[in-house]
Design a protein with these regions (language model features):
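Non-transmembrane, aqueous-exposed alpha-helical and coiled segments at domain scale
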Residues: 1-423
Length: 423
């Protein structure tokens, strides 16, 4: 068996959580391979909404194994809050969830450092969520991090050394903070973490593959936030692309199967950074309100704009996408005209490749216009019900992108999902 990968192709918030939940019945194992609690995956079903920040989105499908991989950074305190909220809703996840011993821990001082670093940038802020993600990955790369497996042996000494190093940095930055309110509940959450099965996830996942079990790898954020290939420096601190699945779970590239790329029928971005198709007018505001475009973790309002096919083709190339999934089609139900950016104009020249640097002043999107469908799609159950104009939009996108759109989402609920090209 091979590992199928599901990841975002834009600037995050594409709807990965919902799709993982929909696809999970076809898999034995769901494994999260990177990121931390800075982004939430939202799922809606049976009249309830759930937001997962660290726990894989396959947790709601009974009997499925869910793994937090080594590429994830884990905040024990936020993890406990998340797990206890699920337990209060009737989901005891201790039998289903395993956690890699090699996943790195977000310390209380990581969160303070994150906030201090952002404050020091002044007007040059990149829009971090302040959850400690960047400093945790910094410690990981500099070989100073604490891992989940460390809590089993001599943890207090390792923690004290890391804390002392962080406090020296904070003193040098002249940043005030109060550790007392953060440290006690964090250590209590560490004890809670020990209730879960802590594993050598790379061995376990490869054993599942040898046994013929099917595995779905779940990514967080989106390709355009990748530390290497995103719109740097306005990016996250991990590899959000398909290659991150190999390093974040410990699997061979030869074991990667289908790559599902998720995108919205339009574009959004939260925080700072370039966004060529951003709409700062009534159209963008309508997209925001109709799409409920507010961060599931931070509550921040997302910037909205038309779909960007230059960026989308770039993301598909890097990830080797074999199947596309289009989300939030229903948000565009009310528009008379739908626009799609097919090229950029930079310095008077037409550009089809996503460039090294994109800025608002240098990059002008060139659009193709298509007629809107002006039809409520939220109650549709089959692609046979799609209006002609929507089918034309799908055909246009498939021709431009060269990959079939296998799934179309027409609403936030699990049931508002239409599978195309059934095999």
């Amino acid at each position: 068996m091979k590992v199928d990968v599901l990841l975002g192709l834009q600037w995050g918030d594409e709807g990965k959580g919902k799709v993982v939940d929909v696809l999970t019945p076809s898999y034995d194992v769901v494994a999260r391979f990177q990121g931390g609690p800075n982004a939430g995956h939202t799922l809606e079903f049976e009249g309830k909404k759930y937001i997962l920040r660290s726990i894989p989105s396959g947790i709601f499908q009974g009997g499925k194994i869910n793994i937090i991989g080594n590429g994830v950074v884990l905040d024990p305190l936020l993890f406990r809050e998340e797990a206890e909220a699920l337990a209060a809703s009737g989901y005891d996840i201790r039998k289903q969830l395993r956690i890699s011993k090699k996943a790195h821990l977000i310390m209380p001082t990581h969160r303070i450092l994150d906030q201090a670093n952002e404050a020091a940038k002044g007007t040059g802020k990149i829009g971090t969520t302040g959850k400690g993600i960047g400093p945790t990955y910094t410690d990981k790369i500099s070989r100073n991090g604490l891992r989940v497996g460390d809590i089993l042996h001599d943890f207090e000494k390792k923690y004290a050394e890391a804390k002392r190093r962080h406090e020296n940095m904070l003193r040098a930055m002249n940043y005030g903070y109060n550790m007392a309110d953060l440290e006690k509940p964090w250590f209590e959450a560490l004890e809670y973490l020990k209730q879960f099965e802590l594993i050598d996830s790379e061995h376990e996942i490869n054993e599942y593959l040898t046994e013929g079990k099917s595995v779905l790898a779940e990514g967080a954020q989106g390709t355009m936030l990748d530390i290497d290939f995103g719109s740097y420096p306005f990016v996250t601190s991990s590899n959000t692309v398909c290659a991150g699945c190999c390093t974040g779970l410990g699997i061979s590239p030869r074991n990667v199967g289908e790559v599902y790329g998720i995108f919205k029928a339009y574009c959004t971005r939260v925080g700072s950074g370039p966004f060529p198709t951003e709409l700062k007018d009534e159209t963008g505001e309508e997209m925001c309100q109709r799409g409920c475009e507010f961060g599931s973790v931070t509550g921040r309002k997302r910037r909205c704009g038309w779909i960007d096919l230059v960026a989308l083709r770039y993301a598909m190339m890097i990830n080797g996408v074999s199947r596309l999934i289009m989300m939030k089609s229903d948000v565009l139900d009310t528009f008379d005209t739908i626009k799609a950016c097919v090229t950029y104009q930079i310095d008077g020249k037409e550009v089809t490749r996503f460039p090294f640097e994109v800025t608002e002043t240098s990059t002008t999107p060139i659009y193709t216009e298509l007629p809107g469908w002006k039809t409520d799609m939220t109650t549709m159950k089959s692609e046979d019900e799609f209006p002609e104009e929507f089918n034309a939009y799908l055909s246009f996108l498939e021709e431009e992108l060269g990959v079939p759109i296998k799934i179309v989402s027409v609403g936030p609920d699990r049931e508002q999902t239409i599978i195309r090209y059934t095999e």
